């Protein structure tokens, strides 16, 4: 339709058709469509030789925010998928042509495009949406297919395709890795100061359902799918000076997780922001390392500015804004019945219930004390064991294998602290958390 009639307020576009002129350069034309496309279809209609393929790029195969990679289908050929470097780049409000071939970007050539938007609706139980449609945690299946992922979606979410994943070996000493669909094969360890690395075989996003290839049952993954008002992955380039970055979460972020993508092998920390830092007072002046540490005061990380519903701010700190480097940023927000980003003060007594507004308990919980350095990033989930009798913990910041610390119990409204231990419930201690709900029964 010519008018913007889609979306929650019936004022957004779902599809945009148009054309562009090629310039023959690897810094090809930037095509603004007014939204972040997940699928782009291209066709040259006035080029040398008079013919050009139909190209289909989409996020399910390999349509990245990074400049380097893409996979596509040539619609009028017999190949099922072709991969290449520097062909097309996803942007927050459109896309940029990076290839120089006659089929995509001949100098003076004319090309048409069709750009299609991703999900626009905020998850809502009224329409049958469930937490497991947007989050899953599972052991690997050792699937070696490049079509079906090693880590599957939940049983009631057969088409689950995550956009952000964390991965490790629960039963052994192990790194904990993070990766995103937008960064492709790039990943890094949150429990290590070393830089990013690449893995073109295992870090495989072009599968459905699930994620990854050839991960066996000794590996475990936590997986989030982007959804408006819930979770979203952003990619940006550092400037070395103050900058604001527009985001597409569709809500004000309450937690942000950031890491540098390059250069490959360059040491770097993973940085967190959370609305509960400093007990919720001026949290924009603080950040957390993904390490065994307390909240750090530094106005040069988030530029002394809290995120808004449309952008987040960055200061001059290399950790989040080194000039010329690429960064991944994962944004989280609370959504009733699906996910809760919160904070609490410990009371020093077992039985302390943290009310997340859920009705059937928590599928996943991450907790970190912020006012002392002697605490871990503690992770719990129902697949490995979170119930009325067990709480299997993995610390995101260290290498140790999982164990039953007996700290948490399930509670219908969220989770219960079954201990007075200072890591999760010291009297007067400040804690931040991220919790994902169980599906309603």
Regions of interest found by a model, annotated:
Residues 1-441:
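Surface-exposed molecular-recognition determinants
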